Amino acid sequence: MSLELLSKLETKIQAALETIELLKMELEEEKQKNHTLNEQNQQLSQDLTSWNEKVTGLVGLLNDEVSE
């Protein structure tokens, strides 16, 4: 191979490595976002369960009052 071809190959390999590094960084960012969203989803699910329990309790109290 000529030096020119080796130089071009080296440039392409370097560009590929830089692209891989950028993609790795983006992947880590997306993993962190996913983790944060999963935590928020879990909290919202707990909040929803809590509100459902409260509403069910209030509806039960209203039913008791209406029945009396």
UniProtKB/Swiss-Prot annotation:
Cytoplasm is among the record's keywords: yes
Keywords: Cell cycle, Cell division, Coiled coil, Cytoplasm, Septation
Principal location: cytoplasm
Compartments reported by the entry: Cytoplasm
Recorded coiled-coil stretches: 3-58
Gene Ontology CC annotation, any one: cytoplasm
InterPro entries: Cell_div_ZapB
GO biological process, one term: FtsZ-dependent cytokinesis
Summary of the function given for this chain in its UniProt record: Non-essential, abundant cell division factor that is required for proper Z-ring formation. It is recruited early to the divisome by direct interaction with FtsZ, stimulating Z-ring assembly and thereby promoting cell division earlier in the cell cycle. Its recruitment to the Z-ring requires functional FtsA or ZipA.
Record's subunit section: Homodimer. The ends of the coiled-coil dimer bind to each other, forming polymers. Interacts with FtsZ.
Family that this chain belongs to: Belongs to the ZapB family.
Protein name: Cell division protein ZapB
